[in-house]
Amino acid sequence: MAYVPAPGYQPTYNPTLPYKRPIPGGLSVGMSFYIQGTAKENMRRFHVNFAVGQDDGADVAFHFNPRFDGWDKVVFNTKQSGRWGKEEEKSMPFQKGKHFELVFMVMPEHYKVVVNGSPFYEYGHRLPVQMVTHLQVDGDLELQSINFFGVQPAETKYPAMTGPPVFNPCLPYVGALQGGFTVRRTIIIKGYVLPTAKTFAINFRVGSSEDIALHINPRIGDCLVRNSYMNGSWGTEERMVAYNPFGPGQFFDLSIRCGMDRFKVFANGIHLFNFSHRFQALRKINTLEINGDLTLSYVHI
């Protein structure tokens, strides 16, 4: 079963370098960009460019450039009319050989940069964001995923993702699904299974009741349980999966889509399982709960 991302959400898994991709519809305030990668052991530099065009010599509205080669700092700058402006800099938040999560949020007055869940820098706009057409990434790093949020959706039968994602939410996480589930609605959950993890749970609850329409329960090193809790009783467990992405110390990108007669769940762009609806009043399924032995990178509901 092929994975079709929800409109407004554009993931790329294990992209190769150099990474150069157009931003559908161009850049605008409210967009977010999530980059998951690993700094190489011999890292000297890497960069992320919000570029005005696809060519290597194009102007750059925002140049984000970590440098380990004797500087151990991050340089921020803008290239306008072929000339670099005045550099801004801050001390290095990355470590050689270590995994990182990097988020860029396009705000009205600046780019907000978040590194590993902590606010890192705000870079004021020197060029109008509407001029930016491409995202470029290259250097001494390995990429696991790059995700665009809030991009201009292409024509599709799926409803667009509404509202911005919540980055690095605390646990237990409780989120309201405004309007409940509807057919083709998609929920995105990206997280990290702790190295010592035993279990965690993702629950879609029904109103203020105790009912759970869909219970997803990875039991690390054992199985992946799916079930429902209705009228005070658990239903029949389902455990069969082609593969289990929830290993200790593993990142995951989970997409949960509501179909006419079932939930369709994908992990890292690969179909994981289906779960037939046991609770039919989909709009009453209006709360998402997540808790257990994991950390959350973002939730988009």
UniProtKB/Swiss-Prot annotation:
Gene Ontology BP terms: antibacterial peptide biosynthetic process; defense response to bacterium
**Alphabetized Gene3D superfamilies for the sequence:** 2.60.120.200
Q: Which InterPro entries match?
A: ConA-like_dom_sf, Galectin-like, Galectin_CRD
Note whether Repeat occurs among the keywords.
yes
Give an example GO molecular function.
carbohydrate binding
> Does the keyword 4Fe-4S feature in the UniProt annotation?
no
**Pfam families from the xrefs?**
Gal-bind_lectin
Q: Where is the Galectin domain?
A: 19-149, 173-301
Q: Which domain of life is it from?
A: Eukaryota
Keywords associated with the record: Lectin, Repeat
PANTHER family per record = GALECTIN, GALECTIN-4
Which comment does the entry carry about domains?
A: Contains two homologous but distinct carbohydrate-binding domains.
- Which named protein is this? Galectin-6
Recorded name of the encoding gene: Lgals6
